[in-house]
Design a protein with these regions (language model features):
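Aromatic-rich, lipid-facing transmembrane alpha helices and their immediate juxtamembrane interface loops
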Residues: 1-237
Length: 237
């Protein structure tokens, strides 16, 4: 456990750089403006958090945090998922619904599986587990949710993204490069700090004492109760 914790930071950096490199290639091939994708991420991350919060309220009768980060109601899974769908499915607007559905279901299943694996191997935490559901794949995704991804892909390509794209084009702040850059830097710092807080949380649970000033800062400002309030469904590996 201690050895895994010791090298987890390097593992996160390596996998993160690989993901960024892959996304950059996909974005370049899609021809979609990077600034627009940043706004797609921000809007989708916000809407995803709101949808999940309302869903939990309706299903369980309680208000539960569904945010992926320490600051702000943003779901990174939804945000990145929207960007992935936008980039991968670009150019498929005129394709038959069945084709978009199958490609979207396949991509969505891979995306959900990779997200689950990534958070478990890097953060030592499990945020969802579908082992109890039939036709699940390693507990990380299942055929039912892959079908949901397929349906969402059709709706995204045929209706949501075209409308969102036009909405973004009309935003005055979209044409201010500085605002877009500030949002991007904010979310990157927010995600990095959130990951650091989660890693330190798993270290504390494993009995690892703070050994650096950063560890001490995180322990003083992001105690267990705060982490568990933001991520109430999180399970330790």
């Amino acid at each position: 456990m201690r050895r895994l914790i010791k090298y987890r930071g390097l593992l996160i950096i390596g996998i993160f750089l690989l993901i960024v490199f892959t996304l950059c290639i996909m974005i370049k091939c899609s021809g979609i403006q990077l600034d627009k994708l940043i706004w797609v991420f921000m809007i989708s991350a916000l809407l995803g958090d709101v949808i999940e919060t309302l869903y939990c309220r309706a299903l369980e009768g309680i208000w539960m945090s569904r945010s992926s980060v320490l600051y702000g109601p943003f779901s990174i899974v939804w945000g990145i998922g929207a960007v992935v769908l936008t980039v991968v499915l670009s150019g498929l607007e005129s394709k038959p619904v069945g084709v978009v559905f199958l490609i979207g279901a396949f991509i969505g299943g891979i995306y959900e599986y990779v997200c689950s694996w990534f958070t478990e191997i890097t953060l030592g935490s499990i945020f969802w587990d579908y082992s109890w559901m039939p036709l699940n794949i390693g507990g990380r995704t299942n055929l039912l949710y892959m079908a949901f991804w397929g349906a969402l892909s059709v709706i995204w390509v045929k209706w949501i993204y075209p409308k969102m794209s036009r909405f973004i084009d009309k935003l005055p702040v979209f044409h201010l490069k500085s605002v877009t850059r500030i949002l991007a830097v904010f979310m990157i710092c927010n995600a990095v700090l959130s990951a650091a807080a989660l890693i330190r949380y798993t270290e504390r649970k494993a009995g690892v004492a703070a050994s650096t000033m950063i560890d001490q800062f995180i322990d003083e400002n992001y105690e267990d109760s705060r982490i568990e309030k933001i991520w109430p469904n999180m399970m330790m590996k």
